Each structure stands twice: as structure tokens, then as C-alpha cells.
Amino acid sequence: SKKADSKHWVTSELFYDKDGNMYFAGVDSSAWCLYRMNLKTQEISEVFKLDNKSTRNYTKLAGYDGQYFYVFDKPDLSKGIKNITTDDKNIVYILDTNGEIKDTLEFNQESTKTTADVNILGGDRRYLLVTTTDTDIQQFKASSELMSKYEELKKRMETEGSSKLAQVCLSAVLDKADIGTGNKEWIQITPE
């Protein structure tokens, strides 16, 4: 525990709990950290530390729902898609307010086993919402009907010589009651 100082780089993601604590992400020379600051005493303590020596990863505090923190650690796509390998992981660490990992979510493409690009959008108290434009993710594959529509749109755009991209956005939710149980059932909510 230490008094607030400026040696840590702090992001703009601030979250508060019911006990008068503020949580924020920061980095030091070798790690991404989640910190807790008691707003009365200004004491700062480290809650969770993720070794981040690799320049290949991008780590973000994706959210806090009053019970869990969602820390998103994924390959840095700005380094170039060709540099991403099957060793690179796309993981969401689900932590309690003491920094204990309660569960992890990993997103990979089914055909190549490489990382899939997803967005963690929070959700509500009951569900965690995830979206993606990748159509080949193990956890929530696009339906055959949606894929047929997508392929038809891609063909039409190619034959018309359009410079626009045909994209599909898949959405799925995870019941937060499944966190920590080992039974993670994704519920597909993408409209057809």
C-alpha cells in the first residue's frame, strides 16, 4: 500500500465500488496493473498484475459491473495481422475486487485457431455482451442463413465493383451466473 504518486501511467478508465474505492488501470516498466485507491485515505494498492513485457499485446480494462472486472488482453492488431500467430491469445480475465481470477474467456477462430477480434461491450447485471465481425469464432458461429446472406452480399458488391466492404456483426451474451462454473454457454442474439 502506498500514498498516491505519479510514477504510474494511468488510463482514463475509472471505476468505483460501494465501499468508497476507485479502481484504475496503469502500467509500470514491465506490467499492466489494476489498482485500488481508497478515496478517504488515498492509499493505493495493487489488485492485479499482468506481465506485459511483450510488445505484441494490447491490454485494456474493459469494464466493471459491480461484481467483476473484465480485463481484455489481446494481440496488438496495429502490429500487423500477419504477425499474429496461434501462440497469441485473445483472453478476457474475469476478476473479483480482490484481483482473484474467477474465470477466463478465450476467443479464437475455428478454422485457423488464431485469435479472433472481439469487442467486450459490457452488458447488464445478468449478461456479458460480446460482438465481432469475424464469422468463424468457436464460441458463437454465424448461422448458415446469415452466412448465405453475407456471401450473397459479398458477391454482389464484387460484381458491382463496389469499394465498400461487406461485413456482418455477430452478437452473443454469456449468462454471468456461468462465471466460475466451467460451463460457459454463449447465447446467440444476432438478428437474422
Where do the PLM segments sit?
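Beta-propeller fold detector
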Residues: S1-K2, S45-D51, K102-N108, N183-P191
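Short loop/turn segments immediately following beta-strands, especially the blade-tip
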Residues: A177-I179
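Short beta-strand elements that form the blades of beta-propeller/WD-repeat-like
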Residues: F15, G20-V27, G63, Q67-N83, ...
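Short loop/turn segments that connect beta-strands within beta-propeller blades
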Residues: N38-Q42, D96-E100
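Repeated scaffold domains used in trafficking and secretory/extracellular systems
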Residues: D5-F15, K53-G66, E110-R125, I187-E192
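Long, acidic/polar, low-complexity amphipathic helices and coiled-coil-like
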Residues: S1-V27, W32
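Structural motif
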Residues: S30-Y35, L77-Y93, D136-R156, S163-L174
